[in-house]
Amino acid sequence: MELQTLQEALKVEIQVHQKLVAQMKQDPQNADLKKQLHELQAKITALSEKQKRVVEQLRKNLIVKQEQPDKFQIQPLPQSENKLQTAQQQPLQQLQQQQQYHHHHAQQSAAASPNLTASQKTVTTASMITTKTLPLVLKAATATMPASVVGQRPTIAMVTAINSQKAVLSTDVQNTPVNLQTSSKVTGPGAEAVQIVAKNTVTLVQATPPQPIKVPQFIPPPRLTPRPNFLPQVRPKPVAQNNIPIAPAPPPMLAAPQLIQRPVMLTKFTPTTLPTSQNSIHPVRVVNGQTATIAKTFPMAQLTSIVIATPGTRLAGPQTVQLSKPSLEKQTVKSHTETDEKQTESRTITPPAAPKPKREENPQKLAFMVSLGLVTHDHLEEIQSKRQERKRRTTANPVYSGAVFEPERKKSAVTYLNSTMHPGTRKRGRPPKYNAVLGFGALTPTSPQSSHPDSPENEKTETTFTFPAPVQPVSLPSPTSTDGDIHEDFCSVCRKSGQLLMCDTCSRVYHLDCLDPPLKTIPKGMWICPRCQDQMLKKEEAIPWPGTLAIVHSYIAYKAAKEEEKQKLLKWSSDLKQEREQLEQKVKQLSNSISKCMEMKNTILARQKEMHSSLEKVKQLIRLIHGIDLSKPVDSEATVGAISNGPDCTPPANAATSTPAPSPSSQSCTANCNQGEETK
């Protein structure tokens, strides 16, 4: 059949996936293995989608068969055992389809078995969100399996809760096929139907005319947080002891054959009435993860506990797993992991005892502590568990979480700025997986938390997977080593891993040799990559820096603004200097022109003085001539004739001989007569 071939192909791909997972544990930094792992996960997802379509087709066929009146009998699929064996390692889509398919059977058989005895075990569970199922996959091994079969894949029991129904459950767990009959009797509003599918085949019989079936659709919760770096794997191994006490339940009506699997009991109580020793579940301490005690807590003040004990052939310790829902819309998983290398003794489950209530704190004391900034021990544990909060992937099986093998994230820039150590002591490369300094987390009590809800002021119930180690306390992962880290895993230049230098302002990392220019030593203090430096200089986009980085970058922006203003002032100063030089040159030119003008003025004034002196001489000459004319009128004619004749005139011989004295004056007068006329 097509479904069987798909399951075989899925089985082969899952085996290859497990081999790759083992190789990734040896070499978690290998990029090729990561690529192969992602491709293999894509193949598995595609196969699961095909199987989903096949299951939907089978469901349609069942609906068609249901429409036939009078006789209707559901035949078990021959591949049910194979599906149950491979369900643990298939993705969440396959688990959802199988759960819907089995719930389809359960609703059909619900109307066929209304006559159940009162001695059979009744199960009630608290209401959950409409159209949301919570798959819980647990491994169980039988006590009669031979030693050669112990290593094979164990049986899987699936617990499915569907809204708006409440059923009475009757199970007989045997080595033979399990007959599972449920009644549609409604015992209370808001309750839910619970179905348990065990190993081998499931036979469901319906004799009355069927009713239309409503199949709930699963809506995966939105991913509000990034993928976790580590998810614990719930794999309880078989244990040898078969005398594990469990909270008592009404005895079954049928003759009890030898039990292959221990009975499954679900109890419900509210925090107002604390459980007694008969219906309470003692929390089991974890050594190396064997028997699982799973407590599921709801914030509606109701608690549903599921206890499953799995006997086996080997001696091992118990294991405690606690699940809760912090809100009605999202589920978070917080993991505390502590390794245990030496197991000195195997622990067994003690008889059930009532869990201790949380210590009552005085409200005035709490208010005083809050005003001082102090916290109580319970609040401290809550804060430390919140620091390790991780978002679980949509796959219910943690084996398929691809985030398990992602590389360790590096410290964020806020860590370096908030740290009190010297900035030069920052080391290159990836920080260690576990912090060397023991924090408060290592000093918390290793005993598991009580199985009842918190006090009313702490209505937020937390989801924890607790694996405490009893021998040696190993420090918890540093809360700052992975929380809020945004850095990449590979060098931004060569895209390879190794010892990387992280930028304190962005998510990029670099090798020292890949930088331009390359660095020889680790820079002290805050280091900014070249891209961030260019970005801050260009101011292409504003980056909202968180926390202390906002102060740093505001100072950087202030310095950049001051530097820019300084550059502007320097440029202005240089422009002014250049303009001054030009003005000085103009001043020199003007001074030269002024000096030339002054020289010309001086020359003109000198010539003017000379002309004035010459005029004075002419005037004196004229006066002399007038004086000669008055004294000697005879000679005046000759003098006037000499003046009128100019330089070419020659006095007569008698005049020259008779008046020799005025002859030089007449000569000077004739020499300057023309110049005097010009000046006049």
From Swiss-Prot:
On subunit structure and binding partners, the annotation says: Component of a BHC histone deacetylase complex that contains HDAC1, HDAC2, HMG20B/BRAF35, KDM1A, RCOR1/CoREST and PHF21A/BHC80. The BHC complex may also contain ZMYM2, ZNF217, ZMYM3, GSE1 and GTF2I. In the complex, it interacts directly with HDAC1, HDAC2, HMG20B/BRAF35, KDM1A and RCOR1/CoREST.
Q: Where is the composition biased (Basic and acidic residues)?
A: 327-345
Phosphothreonine PTM sites in chain numbering: T350, T444
- Give the DNA-binding residues: 425-437
> Where does it live in the cell?
Nucleus
- Which residue intervals are annotated with compositional bias (Polar residues) in the record? 444-453
What keywords tag this UniProt record?
Answer: Chromatin regulator, Coiled coil, Disease variant, DNA-binding, Epilepsy, Intellectual disability, Isopeptide bond, Metal-binding, Nucleus, Phosphoprotein, Repressor, Transcription, Transcription regulation, Ubl conjugation, Zinc, Zinc-finger
Among CDD domains, the record links this protein to: PHD_PHF21A (cd15523)
Instruction: List, alphabetically, the Pfam families matched.
Output: PHD
Output compositional bias ranges, type Low complexity. 84-100, 651-671
Instruction: Give the Phosphoserine positions (modified residues).
Output: S447
| Coiled coil start-end | 558-603
**Stretches annotated zinc finger (PHD-type):** 488-535
Q: What is this protein called?
A: PHD finger protein 21A
Location of region: Disordered: 82-118, 318-363, 440-463, 639-680
Q: Where is this cross-link: Glycyl lysine isopeptide (Lys-Gly) (interchain with G-Cter in SUMO2)?
A: K65
Q: Which GO terms describe its cellular component?
A: DNA repair complex; histone deacetylase complex; nucleoplasm
Q: Which disease is it linked to?
A: Intellectual developmental disorder with behavioral abnormalities and craniofacial dysmorphism with or without seizures: An autosomal dominant neurodevelopmental disorder characterized by impaired intellectual development, developmental delay of varying severity, impaired motor skills and language delay. Additional clinical features include macrocephaly, obesity, overgrowth, craniofacial dysmorphism, epilepsy, and variable behavioral manifestations including autism and attention deficit-hyperactivity disorder.
The protein's role, per its UniProt record: Component of the BHC complex, a corepressor complex that represses transcription of neuron-specific genes in non-neuronal cells. The BHC complex is recruited at RE1/NRSE sites by REST and acts by deacetylating and demethylating specific sites on histones, thereby acting as a chromatin modifier. In the BHC complex, it may act as a scaffold. Inhibits KDM1A-mediated demethylation of 'Lys-4' of histone H3 in vitro, suggesting a role in demethylation regulation.
Q: Where is this region: Required for transcriptional repression?
A: 486-680
